[in-house]
Amino acid sequence: MRKLLDAHGNQLVPALLAIMTLAVFWQVLGHDFLNYDDDDYITANRYVREGLTPASVAWAFTTFHESNWHPITWLSHMLDYRLFGLHAIGHHFVSLLIHLANVLLLYQILRSMTGSIWRSGFVAALFAVHPLHVESVAWVSERKDVISTLFALLAILAYLHYVACPGLLRYALVVGLFALGLMSKPMVVSLPAVLLLLDYWPLDRLNSVGRFQRFRRLLAEKLPLLVLSTASSVVTCLAQKSGQSLGTLERFPLVARIGNALVSYVAYIWKAVYPAKLAVFYPHPGSSLPLSEIIGAFAFLTCVTWLAVLAASRRPYIAVGWLWYIVTLVPAIGLIQVGWQGMADRYTYVPLVGLFIVAAWGIPDLVCGLVSRWKTKPSEGYVLPFSAALSLGVVACMSIIILAAAAWKQTGYWKDNFTLFGHALRVTRDNAVAHNNLGLAYAAEGKARQAIIEYTKAIEIEPGWADAHNNLGILYLRMRQIEPAEVQFRHVLKIAPQHPAGHNNLGATLLQKGDTNEAIKHFRAAIKADPRYARAYINLGTALDMIGRSDEALRSYLDAVRVDPTMADAHYNLGLSLAQKGKIKDAIKHYEEALRLHPDWPEAMNNLAWLLATQKRPSYLEALKAVRLAKKACEMSNYSDPVFLDTLSVAYAAADRWDEAIKTARKALSICRDPKTAEILKTRLGYYQLHTAVPP
């Protein structure tokens, strides 16, 4: 039986891994995009939505957007958008496929290094379905986790080929794959240290003879990789600083960071063993951690590290697995605080592999010691009696099934914003981020009362969080509650005086109050804080138009189109401004672009139809296009807008369809309530009856 399993294990294990991974995560294909980073990474990112164009590719390699430099991740999202558009199923499917590839690669790497099919399969199975890894797979914005790990694992596989047959080209492949991993997510900066650990075990490149000299040589061998790690770390710090993502020492004192890091190391281990109450966001405890808890964590980590080093000569996998966990978690442990979270499940995607290795090799060795039946074979190591091996296999399978069931349940929480953040609020305390994002979800559904409650709770927990005040202000503004909106936006600017959205939204509020000049000041302040803020340019143009400064307004609309050519509003306003200047051909082009970006926009259809029909000597095809556009605008308004009907009548007249022009003008006149517009319609109707188009 054992021989049969070993003979077919290398075919059976990958198949089982694939089936298990797909069974747990297949449900993500029915999940939505989330309001937690998915908008910035995909749904509202104009460069991603351009697809793989020269401009978007250049942006990917030069931007620090989202406080990161990860061009390969951006390119993967652009390719997804080109293939699937905004259908979330395709984006989730790609992330799932990459995770599956990582599972199979991890198995192949461990089996190649150790020769152990079943232990390697056990590690890969834990990696595949552990609930802590759900976040990296089920969250589209965390594509950077799975894709950076893909390149890191490919680099390790290439390294194994290099070790087997050293050569410059093979080493260059290792360096190249590592560089791609760093350009996907800098979390893999610790790969050179991981390779040194693998040199010790299981590659055994540090034997007892001349160990120090060999270590120096192996360290020198890693220098090109260390240079890349250093460069990536510097770039990452610059990116985080530019995006103001680095936590200040005032908010997160160094002592608090060290304490949280020590406790988090132990907490991740506990969650690996008992993955309960997992959440998308864990609030940072700050300085509230008990000193006894910090000292206890330090003592635990010190003792385990000491024991692992002591066992290194006889059980090298313990030291390698433990140090893998410690070293690969360093970039995300919070000594350099990024964001507000105290911990994050996604940070364990690679580090837990080290603990899985300790379990996969350590538990069988422990059982061997307990049953006192060791059989040493140079090629196979320690061999368990079949009955003990079978029992151990059953326990391992049960453990994997339990973890898979927990992961399946955890994956379900990522279905949409309501389930995700609702669950986070149930399993955490004082979670301002969860309240805020749940508020965003309610606001998107038009449930203003519930959204206000959630925003208010977020502000109660984090009074100094400018974005929460801004979100509440936006909601009040949409509800036409001008005074409460102004209060919130002024709170934003008190907290963060250079907050671009705060200035823009306060400007919009003041514009509704009629304080146009003050609104203009805030729109300009928003642009100064963020020169690529297209919405602020549009609002500035609107305000300038309102006080008759049409030339400046036109320049502002041109700036809006320049910084964001994919914003339909910018093209619409620019078209309106150009038409007022008599630049009809240019105005038509921008209305057409607005409709390309926003196909179901009746006002844009109406304005474009008007220009096509009323320009000097419109062609027959232009007149037909005007009719089609104006008719669709009327259909979308259920033929209840006299302005749209007037445009349709003019379009019919331009196409020499006089009876339809007369009928439509009469319909417009019958529902028109504005005396001036009614007079225009009467005059137009008289001309139509003479089969003559009146000048607009």
Show where each model-derived region lies:
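Polytopic membrane enzymes that build or remodel cell-surface glycoconjugates and lipids
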Residues: 1-481, 490, 494-501, 505-508
